[in-house]
From Swiss-Prot:
UniProt entry keywords in alphabetical sequence: Glycoprotein, Membrane, Signal, Transmembrane, Transmembrane helix
Protein name: Uncharacterized protein R09E10.5
Transmembrane helix keyword on record: yes
InterPro entries: AMOP_dom, DUF7658, Epithelial_Barrier/Signaling, F54D1_6-like_C, F54D1_6-like_Ig-like, F54D1_6-like_Ig-like_2, NIDO_dom
Amino acid sequence: MRRGCRHHLAAVVLLIATFPPLAYNQNIGGINQNIGGTPQNPTINQVSPGQIFSGTGNNPFYGVNLVPFGPEAGDLMVNPSMLTSGMTIDLYMFFPYYGGLYNYTTISVNGYLGFATVLDQGPTINVGPETTDWPRQEDPAMIAPYLCKQQVPQQGNPARRAGVYYRLLLRQSLFGRESNSNLNLGGTLQQNAFFGQQASQACPGTADSYVRCDSNSDYFLDQMMIWVQEGVAGGAMFRADAAVVVTWYNTASAISGRSDIDAGQTGTYQVIWLTDSTARLSYVIINYDRLGFDAQDFRGNSRSGRCRAVFNGGNHTGTVEVDPTQPYKNTPKVLAQRSGVPHMVRGRYMFRVDDVVRPAGCSNKTGGTYPIMIYPNIVNMLGDMTVDVNACCLDRTQTYIMMIEEREVATCQVINPAIARCSLPRIYDWGTKTVYFQPESRGANDEKAFVGYIYFVPPTLDPMRLDIGNIYEWYKNPMTNYLMPITWYPRNFTNPDILTNGNNMGVRISDDSMYGVQLGLYIVGYREFKDDEIKKFRPEYRTLARITTYSNQNNANYRWMPQEEVINTNQVQQWYLTDWERMHTLYTYRVGFFKLAPINPNDANGTQLLPGLVSAPISLHWLWTPENQQFATLTLNQQDRDQRIEFVKEKSREMCHDWYDEDGALWNFIRDTETNTSCPCIETQALLDLGRFMPHPRCSQMFRDITCTTVIGSKNCYMSSSNIYSSYAGNGNTFNNMDTNRFMTHYGQVCCYDESGYLMQTPYQPVIKTQREYFYNPGYPLRAYEFGTAPYMGQFEVPGLSVFHNDYMPYFLCCKFADFRCQMFYWRRPSSACQQYQPPAIGHAQGAGVFQTIDNDKFIFNQPGVFNFLYIPQSVRTPEVRIQTRLERYPNRKVDFGLLGRYISQYELVQPTNATVITGIALEATGTERVIVMTRKDTRRFRYRTNIIVGNILRYFDTIRLQRFRGVLIYVNNVERGQPEIYVVLEEAQIGVKVTESYALDIDRLPNYQESMGMLDIQISVSPQYGVRPDGDKTQETQYRQMYNLPRVSGLIRPYPDQTSGSLNEGLTLNDVNSDSYRQQIINNYLVLGTGEPGTQQNQAGTLNQNMPQDNMFTTSRDEDKQFDVFPEASMRSEPVYKTAPIFDTGSYRFVPQTGAMILQLLNTCRDLQNNPNTDLQPYQSIATLSYGLQCPDDPGQVLTECGDSVACLYDYALLNSKVLGQEEQDAWNMFTTDRALAIRQYNSCGAINIEYPEYMMKTPALSSGYLQGDVARFECYQSHWVKGDHEYKCGIVVDYNRPNEYRFEWNKGNQPWCRSRIKENYFKWLAVIAGIVGIIIVILLIFLVFWCIKRKKLQESRNYSGTAAYSNNAFQNQTYETKPSRALSVGDLSTAPRTVAMPPPRGTTATPMTLEPRGFSPVPSDVRGSQGMLGLNTSV
């Protein structure tokens, strides 16, 4: 046996000997009835040792790989008279196939289930784009297990039961007749006699007897689900509710003779078509029991046409071969020998067919390209998950690996020969990554790597993340409930011991025991910390604790039902931190996430967690506890809860201060966010600026996500659609940086708008917020962009987690958990006030060729072909941008398909009109993927109305609506069914495109339409860096283009780039409808050569369009995408949507552009015919009806009345003959014109007023804009406070009169407003009064003291002690022995004193003369004893 993916017949036989097929009753096999025996439970039994595989079972007529069929199983046989043309049966519900929905099918002996008329003229039945000329010839959709001309033998032994059998099986629950779980577990397949059932006993509402809806049908559907689960990656998610079983038994080639039939050259094969009740998923199982011929003529040679096993989408949507290998091309009979599920049975193949057919199971293809089926193909970037892979047929002795583009290698385990399970490592990236699957032998045995893709998403956007309830509840302190819900699907977990013990040979995916495992719920912390070993800051993931343990429910009831448990936030089962780390290191992890994974008994430290599911990022504050609370109990009393709340507040305050200091040490990134991506001033600008801003994926009405946590309260939030690009900001940045490239930063911008459409400002948040949970949360710039930054590995670069660590969690720490610290956060993260915002140039193409260009020209242009919609050549600062659109003639919807075969032929079903609509758009820029968005073909617009093809592969957006590719961001607004609204952003080019199919109408509410109309509207936004003025002023564009080296922007959306005049307010008139003044100029300049009708282009190639690319982006491929050209998507993008027969390109059917005068004349003529009573007397087939009836709208008078002077409405309504389309065209035109006028306006902003002291202050009005020119902001205080400072401001223009050409916008000058308490104000008043009184008293006393001092001074000056020598007093004069200078007398000259008295000296001292003070009384009498010799003054009068 050879190794690898290549298996020959011997290898398949050996595998079948090891794994015999699933048996009904005692054998697997078609009609191996074992009549009279005891039914047994079907299972995939192991072959006993020594048993020889024969391939026939115990029935000599039927093989082992067929399900029961025939009258005994309830089948009906196709009427022999209808074998060739086919017998149409009713399916009684819709089955999806290749994008269409079918409630019928046509069964033919020629080996197909058809859904349209099949052209079987000639010896060969041709289907598909390569072999049919549709629509001139039929190209029907069909499931063809063996397509070639065949017959049913009419005589002989093989003819005894030869024929085509069919039956329909429906689950009882579809008719409300189910009991219990409706799973007939352990049941048996009872034999039913068809002739014993009356039609009245069939399923309710189904009159045909081939319909079964009883316990046997339920059991059959359950068994088919097991088959799908064992062979298809992701098949466990499918629940079959209906099945169509068709069996071709003993058919022979169409012209074979009796000798061929007797030689056993007959074929027996079977198709089982499964779907669910919602018609969303559909699988086909093909069983080949015996293929005795590979062509339809004598002896099975191929002179008359080879038989094919093929799925055809119909109408040139593409084909898929059952086994596109070289052996199959040599002889299709090999299909009965090989298998896509070799572990089950030979000759069995499985496919998923609800949309473009994808092969399941394994393949023997060893070269070329074969699509891998991977489930899930949307994986969390944190890794540690498993995916199931269908690729090459597997050998258990081999080791298989899956290499991820530019990243690590995933190891894979063989589950069975068709499915491998690969364990993905952690991938520091997000977006689509190409994966390669092959044996580790690396092609030693001619194996080639199978190529597929996996989409890695950040945890914030992962649609398959672990459900832990309302995410916002995890960010509250205190949490509203300590018991939080957790939900998961048990089938997402398997027992790792079964897969790793080396003894899993007999393990089946459908076994319930495989899912019995103990699960641990772990909390993983994330931080960006300093690593001293590498000398850098890097991300770190650490398992902090295991919270609890759950038992994964593995009974059958939980196959589709989720398991619901609770998380006790007061309980921690096991910590992986030491006590010291719990009190210190734990608080360095600001954010974390849950991980649910099987318990690894060998992992004691939580460092080797097994693959599992992770949740969205959550706060870790519920793990913070004071030292006296150690999670010892399951509940907390009120005191403990209060202590924890206060502890969280205090710890949050400390962490807020730490973050404030930490962020302040980093680069001031506000200069980059505000100068390069300033927020739009109003929401309309943000809505139309598609190249630079997008709706917030978690906090906007478009995505309707419930995980918004930080900006609740805004009507809509928008964020920068890519990383902010910065430019050189050093010295000489005015001229020296003109030739420097912009570079990508890791910053992002978030702008939130209130219900009035104005920006919410962070300085006003403390003023407006009146309640703790009041929702006024403005957007703010991000140091770490939410979508991450390449290479997604370092600090600030990890998608989702870096922004929570650096921006979102500090908001909660400062604004939610701590008290009075929100201003600190907003000082570091001030919101943008649009002071540097410049509006983009906006254009729109809608309806039947109605254009509003990006430079404000308006016209209607119709011409089929592929046009250069926008082309920008590459420059030093900007990449090359290429956008092309395909315009096709819209079909005439008045054609009655019921006339097919009587009055009209096949090619006349699609008759074009003279109106062209946009059916596709292709975009790419330098270094990006090529994106193609197209409307789907008619009868294919049910589940998906559009195709989104990236890199030649069809992408789906119904699970995750935002996807990122190389240089391109794509997101859809899937509020309406069928992804009718698609947004494509070229990130570096900053050009955005909005593609809308049929105005995004809700077709379900339009009773006259079964599906959408099939036309695209395109809105484009071009950022101002290209120099296109949105107001249409082009007077100085040439000078600016030369001065600043700007690229030339041209295309169908800007047809006159060299024009020097423009218009701002001119409308659309009838003269602008397909005017000859510009039609041929646009065709010659922008039509891609080789497209459109013959003779359209009047110039030869090479004479014009020297500066325009001429390769058709819809039919060509980039070098890296050419390997996928063999996929059926190639037909979808390269083929026209409304392809017409060649006759409609010539003669009177050629396209004739309709001018405004022609439309008006047509409407007036048709209205006159409508109002002319003689017209009603004419027969229906008259010349008047033939000449005008097919051209006139149904009600021309209503067209003129409804549309009025709206030229766009008149044109669309008249040519498309649809009131809905006409009114929608009018509404879209008016709405875009109004929004565009608002969006291109230059708003002048003063910025928000920074309020430093917001306590007890209110803003009037509270939710007014408060930043635009003319705004008035008044600040008041509540009734308990008085306002201080300047409290009224106006935003206006300030002109420097010394430089009249320089001006700015700012608020009027004033002091900072603030509030003072009335009580404190009264206290200060009383203090002022008391202080005033005391001050007045003090002033009076001071005045009295001053005057008293003055008086005393004057009194002293009035005394003069100086005079004659006799009266001179020398008491204070220095004696001869003193060294100090003489002392002046203080009482003046006393020489005029009347007399002096000599005072007796103290006893024992020498008498010294003294100067006596004048006294107002008489001196002591001289006769007093002891007074002799004394001098005195007599002052008596």
